[in-house]
Protein backbone atom coordinates (compact mmCIF):
# COMPACT_ATOMS: atom_id res chain seq x y z
CA UNK A 1 0.00 0.00 0.00
CA UNK A 2 1.36 3.40 -0.97
CA UNK A 3 0.98 6.23 1.49
CA UNK A 4 0.08 9.51 -0.19
CA UNK A 5 0.17 13.20 0.64
CA UNK A 6 -2.25 15.15 -1.57
CA UNK A 7 -3.76 18.61 -1.84
CA UNK A 8 -1.83 20.20 0.99
CA UNK A 9 -0.48 23.64 1.67
CA UNK A 10 2.28 24.30 4.18
CA UNK A 11 4.35 27.24 5.36
CA UNK A 12 7.37 25.76 7.11
CA UNK A 13 10.37 27.14 8.98
CA UNK A 14 13.06 24.65 10.00
CA UNK A 15 16.25 25.59 11.83
CA UNK A 16 19.02 23.10 12.49
CA UNK A 17 22.13 24.51 14.14
CA UNK A 18 24.74 21.95 13.14
CA UNK A 19 24.62 18.99 10.80
CA UNK A 20 21.74 16.64 10.25
CA UNK A 21 20.38 14.56 7.41
CA UNK A 22 17.11 14.20 5.48
CA UNK A 23 15.37 17.51 6.08
CA UNK A 24 12.35 18.43 3.96
CA UNK A 25 9.52 20.96 4.00
CA UNK A 26 6.91 18.17 4.04
CA UNK A 27 8.91 15.14 5.12
CA UNK A 28 12.49 14.14 5.74
CA UNK A 29 12.14 10.68 4.20
CA UNK A 30 9.83 9.44 1.45
CA UNK A 31 9.41 6.29 -0.57
CA UNK A 32 8.65 2.61 -0.65
CA UNK A 33 11.30 -0.11 -0.45
CA UNK A 34 10.97 -3.00 -2.90
CA UNK A 35 10.93 -5.44 0.03
CA UNK A 36 9.50 -3.80 3.18
CA UNK A 37 9.56 -7.19 4.94
CA UNK A 38 13.36 -6.88 5.21
CA UNK A 39 12.88 -3.74 7.28
CA UNK A 40 10.28 -5.39 9.53
CA UNK A 41 12.25 -8.57 10.10
CA UNK A 42 15.62 -6.96 10.67
CA UNK A 43 14.96 -3.65 12.34
CA UNK A 44 11.32 -3.78 13.40
CA UNK A 45 10.01 -0.88 11.33
CA UNK A 46 8.19 -0.58 8.04
CA UNK A 47 8.91 1.89 5.27
CA UNK A 48 5.22 2.05 4.41
CA UNK A 49 4.96 4.87 6.96
CA UNK A 50 6.82 7.15 4.56
CA UNK A 51 4.83 8.78 1.75
CA UNK A 52 5.35 7.22 -1.66
CA UNK A 53 3.33 9.76 -3.63
CA UNK A 54 3.18 13.51 -3.06
CA UNK A 55 0.70 15.26 -5.34
CA UNK A 56 -0.71 18.75 -5.73
CA UNK A 57 1.02 20.32 -2.73
CA UNK A 58 2.16 23.93 -2.36
CA UNK A 59 4.88 24.61 0.17
CA UNK A 60 6.72 27.71 1.30
CA UNK A 61 9.94 26.85 3.13
CA UNK A 62 12.58 28.69 5.08
CA UNK A 63 15.19 26.10 5.98
CA UNK A 64 18.42 26.91 7.82
CA UNK A 65 20.39 23.70 8.14
CA UNK A 66 24.07 24.39 8.70
CA UNK A 67 26.11 21.46 7.36
CA UNK A 68 23.11 19.16 6.80
CA UNK A 69 22.95 16.72 3.89
CA UNK A 70 19.98 15.92 1.63
CA UNK A 71 17.85 18.96 2.34
CA UNK A 72 14.90 19.59 0.02
CA UNK A 73 12.01 21.99 -0.29
CA UNK A 74 9.53 19.10 -0.16
CA UNK A 75 11.49 15.91 0.62
CA UNK A 76 14.92 15.37 2.12
CA UNK A 77 15.64 11.95 0.59
CA UNK A 78 14.45 8.42 0.06
CA UNK A 79 15.24 5.95 2.82
CA UNK A 80 18.48 4.12 2.01
CA UNK A 81 18.24 0.62 3.42
CA UNK A 82 20.12 -2.58 2.61
CA UNK A 83 21.83 -1.12 -0.42
CA UNK A 84 18.63 0.15 -1.99
CA UNK A 85 17.09 3.59 -2.09
CA UNK A 86 13.33 3.81 -1.62
CA UNK A 87 11.54 5.49 -4.50
CA UNK A 88 8.84 8.14 -4.48
CA UNK A 89 6.87 10.24 -6.94
CA UNK A 90 6.25 13.98 -6.66
CA UNK A 91 3.77 15.51 -9.12
CA UNK A 92 2.04 18.86 -9.64
CA UNK A 93 3.71 20.50 -6.64
CA UNK A 94 5.22 23.91 -6.11
CA UNK A 95 7.78 25.04 -3.61
CA UNK A 96 9.17 28.49 -2.89
CA UNK A 97 11.42 29.98 -0.27
CA UNK A 98 15.04 29.50 0.78
CA UNK A 99 17.51 26.85 1.89
CA UNK A 100 20.61 28.09 3.72
CA UNK A 101 23.65 26.24 5.02
CA UNK A 102 22.89 22.80 3.56
CA UNK A 103 25.76 20.83 2.05
CA UNK A 104 23.56 19.01 -0.49
CA UNK A 105 20.35 20.97 -1.06
CA UNK A 106 17.70 20.51 -3.72
CA UNK A 107 14.83 22.83 -4.52
CA UNK A 108 12.26 19.99 -4.56
CA UNK A 109 14.19 17.02 -3.12
CA UNK A 110 17.61 16.80 -1.53
CA UNK A 111 18.10 13.39 -3.13
CA UNK A 112 15.77 11.52 -5.46
CA UNK A 113 17.67 8.52 -6.80
CA UNK A 114 15.35 6.37 -8.91
CA UNK A 115 12.39 8.58 -8.05
CA UNK A 116 10.12 10.68 -10.28
CA UNK A 117 9.51 14.42 -10.09
CA UNK A 118 7.01 15.69 -12.69
CA UNK A 119 5.16 18.92 -13.44
CA UNK A 120 6.60 20.72 -10.42
CA UNK A 121 7.79 24.30 -10.05
CA UNK A 122 10.38 25.64 -7.66
CA UNK A 123 11.42 29.17 -6.78
CA UNK A 124 13.91 28.42 -4.03
CA UNK A 125 17.02 30.41 -3.22
CA UNK A 126 20.00 28.29 -2.19
CA UNK A 127 22.80 30.18 -0.44
CA UNK A 128 26.31 30.40 -1.84
CA UNK A 129 27.73 28.20 0.94
CA UNK A 130 26.06 25.06 -0.43
CA UNK A 131 28.25 22.39 -1.94
CA UNK A 132 27.16 23.46 -5.40
CA UNK A 133 29.14 20.70 -7.08
CA UNK A 134 26.78 18.31 -5.30
CA UNK A 135 23.45 20.08 -6.02
CA UNK A 136 21.26 17.53 -7.73
CA UNK A 137 23.60 14.59 -7.05
CA UNK A 138 22.37 11.04 -6.97
CA UNK A 139 25.73 9.38 -6.66
CA UNK A 140 26.57 9.40 -2.96
CA UNK A 141 24.70 8.63 0.23
CA UNK A 142 26.50 11.19 2.40
CA UNK A 143 28.54 14.02 0.97
CA UNK A 144 29.34 15.87 4.17
CA UNK A 145 32.66 15.29 5.90
CA UNK A 146 30.69 15.43 9.17
CA UNK A 147 28.64 12.32 8.39
Model-derived features: where do they sit?
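Surface-exposed loop/turn motifs in large extracellular/passenger domains
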Residues: 1-105, 109-147
Amino acid sequence: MMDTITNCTADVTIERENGGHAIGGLCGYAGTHSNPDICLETEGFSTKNYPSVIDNCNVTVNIKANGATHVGGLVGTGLYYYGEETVFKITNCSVKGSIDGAVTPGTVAGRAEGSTIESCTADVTIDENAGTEQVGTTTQMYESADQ
